[in-house]
Regions:
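Amphipathic alpha-helical dimerization/coiled-coil segments
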Residues: 83-115
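Short alpha-helical "packing" element that flanks the helix-turn-helix/winged-helix DNA-binding module
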Residues: 21-28
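Short amphipathic alpha-helical interaction segments
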Residues: 44-59
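Short, Lys/Arg-enriched N-terminal segment that forms or immediately precedes the first helix
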Residues: 1-14
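Short, cationic-aromatic polyanion-contact patches
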Residues: 11-21, 35, 65-88
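Short acidic, hydrophobic short linear motifs in intrinsically disordered regions
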Residues: 32-42
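Short acidic/histidine-centered micro-motifs embedded in hydrophobic/aromatic stretches
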Residues: 27, 42, 97-98
Length: 115
């Protein structure tokens, strides 16, 4: 399994996001900011679907909409911890240090620095 597939699996398992959310989050990490049309080329999804998924990621605390239909991923470590905190709140689990989450944040930061 290659590195990016490992990251995708961890994102889906640990942060309870689906495959399309994972693809869009990683696409946003590749660029400082982008529109749905900017992501459309790489994802083969209609712009409306990309916007819907990006807004879902925004409610999960992982991205922000900086202009109409223009999104940016939060810093990898912040996005991961933010999402983990929300999962803990919803499931009434105490929020505490989680090595898997911390390591996932580091892996994403390294991924972002490589692209």
């Amino acid at each position: 399994m290659n590195h990016i597939n490992h990251i995708k699996i961890l994102l889906m398992e640990e942060l309870q996001i689906n495959n399309l959310e994972t693809d869009i989050f990683l696409a946003l990490m590749k660029s400082e900011k982008t529109t749905s049309f900017g992501m459309q080329e790489n994802l083969n999804l209609p712009p409306d679907q990309i916007i819907e998924i990006a807004k879902s990621l925004e409610t999960k605390g992982m991205v922000i909409e900086i202009n109409k239909n223009e999104f940016r991923a939060l810093h990898p470590r912040f996005a991961i911890v933010n999402r983990y905190r929300r999962i803990c709140e919803v499931n009434n689990i105490p929020f505490k240090k989680n090595t898997k989450i911390d390591n996932l944040g580091i892996m994403l930061e390294n991924y972002q620095n490589q692209v």
